[in-house]
Amino acid sequence: MADEKTEDRRPATLVGAAAATFATNAGTVTFSLLNVLILARALGPTGRGEVAFVIAVWVLTAGLATLGFEEANGNLGGRHPERRASLATNSVVAALALGILGALIVGLLMTLVPRTRGEVDLGLLLFALATLPSGLLGQNLKYLLQSDYRFGVTNLAWFASPAVTAVSNGVLALSGALTVERVVLIFVATNVLATLILVVSVARHFGFGRPDAALARESLSFGLKTHLSKFMALGAYRGDQWLLGAIVGPYELGLYSIAASLAEALFYVSGVIVLVQRPHLVRAVSAQAAEFAARIFRRAVVLSTAVGAALFVAAPTLCVLLFGKSFRGSGDDLRLLALGALGVLALDLFSGVIVAQRRPLLASAGTAVALLVTVIGNIILVPVLGGGGTAVAKSAAFTAGGATMVLIFLRMFDAPPGALIPRLDDVAWYGRKLREGLLAARRAG
């Protein structure tokens, strides 16, 4: 039975939500990297590249097919709790219709233009694409639950997929039975599992109401405004792997994908911040949003800089130590990707701020710049430099896109540039939180 109460569940502070989400993120990253390690050791660069290509195609197609319904759920669900049940049912309808349509379009493209699928088996790609409705539904329901600050269950779903994936692939690898086809099957199955977790939670807390055509039109109207920006951002993040695999094949993609997986530690810093600040920013007036976002950005710069510097120094040794000598070339790619750390942060965080303040079209500027640099850079550099060319293009794209969003944020909120420069207090903030955490742990013990 669905909960009858729809009052605002806003917590007194976002620190707890951020800490829980970041802890889940740390576990997710750990299992994701463990899975990358298993695949690299068991399948080698070429097999790893084939898997990366299938996942890149699936993720990009899902991003294209959403039409922004998940973003609309985040905003409409946050402002109108009484409409969540209808939003849930509309999410199911949209996921089915758009997922099937997206799979048909991309499947037809790859059938008619074989070069777009590189050297990967068409049947394997079509199998993965057939599960798009489940993936879209999971995205829609995740944002709906987060609009009610239900980060616990979305964190569970987020964590379950890579955890089960890593364990399953590990068992198969130890038995010598791991293949590219089985890896893709497990990827699909664990995504369905994550979606089922969210479906159960939505049914319990909101229920599934009657479909609402007027509400669907409102969701589509808002969603389309955010869709271009979000898909371009996804293209900047994942489009390089599709391009690299199609242009030079799975071996180079296998090397690059290892570096990209390790570099995702940079992306998760900004990704977690955007998730936990979204419900607050949706409800905040302009001045509050500007002050809040600037403070969060300064503190995140401190963390992103530290993570980026550590990756740059450790990259060559780290790739060989974890994945073996056959992945030696991944170290140079990782160093190049680490240079884009602050660009990633600025692009993600300020795009999220502007979308939450109901200016989704404006948020597309930075992602448009990033995607343009990504595509042009890959076309020019990949035939000459392989995966290294993709890494250069990606860092340049994030830096250019992030700089664009900084300028837009400062102008939109009339904020001084100095508001974004980290201060000693921002560094000290981490020390204070660490001491508070240790003290709380000591008291609990």
Predicted regions and their residues:
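Interfacial segments at transmembrane-helix termini and the short loops linking adjacent helices
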Residues: 10, 45-48, 110-128, 313-342, ...
